[in-house]
């Protein structure tokens, strides 16, 4: 598999117009090979398969410079955590991540409430937040009680 230099659009400092030129940054430690989604890729030993990040033949680029070579293929697989129906309800990745995050918070809270918190790493945080919320609510109730008590005593005087 051969890889050409990645074309990166950048602004020319002279006239401010966007140009599509090859960016000459051969000394960069970060490889410029794009990640390719290959759903049918066979996973390498010890990996899960899925995304493939370039390791290919060592060929010269357009200007004769050798492209950086990755000795091993990077294979990753991301499995969906939500059923397919949520693709319609939560169209963006941010919405899906927020949904999963909120679900994890509720699951941690349910573990805390039902006493299955021995293995929960968030138990202490939940206890502190619950105590803080209880203190705030009790102060608000005391303020309301004081105000109600003053309102009742004011007409009697």
From Swiss-Prot:
Listed GO CC annotations: host cell nucleus
A Pfam cross-reference name: Herpes_UL33
Origin superkingdom: Viruses
Sorted UniProt keywords: Host nucleus, Viral genome packaging, Viral release from host cell
Keyword Signal attached: no
UniProt family annotation: Belongs to the herpesviridae TRM2 protein family.
Organism: Human cytomegalovirus (strain AD169)
Keyword Transmembrane annotated: no
UniProt subcellular location: Host nucleus
HAMAP family: HSV_TRM2
Designated name of the protein: Tripartite terminase subunit 2
Quaternary data: Associates with TRM1 and TRM3 to form the tripartite terminase complex.
Role, per record: Component of the molecular motor that translocates viral genomic DNA in empty capsid during DNA packaging. Forms a tripartite terminase complex together with TRM1 and TRM3 in the host cytoplasm. Once the complex reaches the host nucleus, it interacts with the capsid portal vertex. This portal forms a ring in which genomic DNA is translocated into the capsid.
Main location as per UniProt: host cell
Annotated Acidic residues bias: 11-27
Location of region: Disordered: 1-69
Gene name as annotated: TRM2
Example GO biological process: viral DNA genome packaging
């Amino acid at each position: 598999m051969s890889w050409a230099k990645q074309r990166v659009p950048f602004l020319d400092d002279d006239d401010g117009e966007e140009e599509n030129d090859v960016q000459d940054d051969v000394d960069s430690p970060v490889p410029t090979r794009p990640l390719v989604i290959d759903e049918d890729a066979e996973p390498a030993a010890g990996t899960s398969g899925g995304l493939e990040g370039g390791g290919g033949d060592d060929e010269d680029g357009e200007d004769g410079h050798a492209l950086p070579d990755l000795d091993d293929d990077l294979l990753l697989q991301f499995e969906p955590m939500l059923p397919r129906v949520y693709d319609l309800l939560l169209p963006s990745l941010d919405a899906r991540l927020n949904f999963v995050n909120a679900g994890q918070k509720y699951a941690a809270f349910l573990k805390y409430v039902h006493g299955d918190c021995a293995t929960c790493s968030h138990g202490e945080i939940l206890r502190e937040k619950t105590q803080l919320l209880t203190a705030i609510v009790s102060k608000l109730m005391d303020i309301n009680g004081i105000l109600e008590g003053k309102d009742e005593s004011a007409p009697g005087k």
